[in-house]
């Protein structure tokens, strides 16, 4: 049984907004301000508007769609479009990610441990 979940750069199209008004489990979100694949105003921001009980665990304003992929796929195996969608935007530093990982772990400890 799933007792808590964390979504990174969630896609709003996957959800009926009304179904997020009262989720049956704690939901945490990691959002990226420069996601060109799932534009925040149509996706993560929409999920946050619909899901007031959701917890924004971390927001990376300069992060792109692949912020939680570690390591990133090698550029040599990506096509041009995939590279544009998955590459880190200029100004994004992956040095922030260990803190994001700690926040995710803390969210799960809070909701899963007795």
Show where each model-derived region lies:
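Active-site-adjacent alpha-helix of alpha/beta-hydrolase-fold enzymes
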Residues: 22-25, 29-94
């Amino acid at each position: 049984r799933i007792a808590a979940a964390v979504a990174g750069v969630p896609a709003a199209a996957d959800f009926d907004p009304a179904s997020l008004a009262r989720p049956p489990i704690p939901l945490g979100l990691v959002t990226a301000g420069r996601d060109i694949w799932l534009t925040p105003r149509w996706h993560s921001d929409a999920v946050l508007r619909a899901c007031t009980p959701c917890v924004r665990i971390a927001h990376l304003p300069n992060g792109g769609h692949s912020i939680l992929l570690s390591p990133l796929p090698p550029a040599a195996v990506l096509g041009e479009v995939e590279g544009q969608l998955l590459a880190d935007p200029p100004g994004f530093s992956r040095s922030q990610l260990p803190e994001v990982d700690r926040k995710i772990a803390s969210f799960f400890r809070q909701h899963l441990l007795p």
